[in-house]
A protein has these predicted regions:
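Residues located in well-ordered beta-strands
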Residues: 18, 32-34, 143-145
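Short, small-residue-biased leader/transition segments that mark boundaries at the very start
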Residues: 1-7
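Short acidic-hydrophobic catalytic motif
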Residues: 8-12, 20
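Internal, well-ordered alpha-helical scaffold/interface segments
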Residues: 17-20, 123
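Non-catalytic connector elements of ABC transporters
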Residues: 28, 39-210
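Elongated periplasmic alpha-helical coiled-coil
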Residues: 25-27, 34
Length: 210
């Protein structure tokens, strides 16, 4: 897989969107993003209905090369498939390879299973944020509203509303949360995942700041 050196098959570095969704409890937060890479290697992204965020890869990344490698791998795969299809006795796969349709948690849920997919470009990404990396912090620049809270022993699983979107976080300690309270949020650590929306593959991991 393209980018496999940066995205190992572990909890925090899955190879693609499907694996990221499958691994972990509570489930990962998927956030659609749109943006470009700057000269310093970072990406300025528009997320969560219009907010601006800065993603910095943990390792050096040249996105244009990554996209070129992705396209070359896809072309080779298509050529190999065409060659196999020409062989006698070839049976086409019933489960054709398709990009995993991830779920975006929203306050007002919609059934988009039959919706037509928008045109995806190289400026379209998906961020993967594990709940343990969403923190309530006084210095946080992201504002959210407590939408739900479930104490589970030494930690609490919280649902936070940001605009029309819902994010899941895991907060350690015995704090009590009041529904509707506004809280400052930050995304911690350097294991925030950046996925290619076109292929579903993990590009790299890094930090995310608002």
């Amino acid at each position: 897989l393209v980018g496999s050196e940066m995205c190992k098959e572990t909890d925090h570095h899955p190879a693609n969107l499907f694996v990221a969704d499958f691994v972990g409890n509570p489930s990962i937060n998927f956030v659609e993003a749109k943006g470009k890479q700057a000269a310093d290697g970072s990406l300025t992204l528009t997320v969560l209905g219009g907010l601006t965020a800065r993603f910095r890869p943990a390792k050096a990344l040249e996105l244009s090369k990554w996209f070129a490698d992705r396209d070359a791998a896809a072309a080779k795969k298509a050529a190999d498939l065409k060659e196999k299809a020409a062989q006698k006795g070839y049976v086409e796969k019933g489960n054709k390879d398709e990009v995993f349709r991830y779920h975006i948690a929203k306050v007002d849920e919609e059934d988009d299973s039959l919706a037509e997919l928008p045109e995806i470009t190289n400026e379209d990404f998906v961020l993967g944020i594990r709940p343990e990396f969403l923190d309530i912090a006084d210095e946080g620049n992201l504002r959210g509203e407590i939408y739900g809270a479930m104490p589970t022993g030494m930690e609490s699983t919280i649902k936070v509303r940001v605009g029309g979107f819902l994010l899941t976080g895991v907060v350690f300690g015995s704090s009590l949360f009041t529904i509707g309270t506004e809280v400052p949020l930050s995304v911690t650590g350097d294991q925030i995942m950046l996925f290619d929306r076109k292929s579903g593959q993990c590009i790299t991991s890094g930090t995310l700041n608002f």
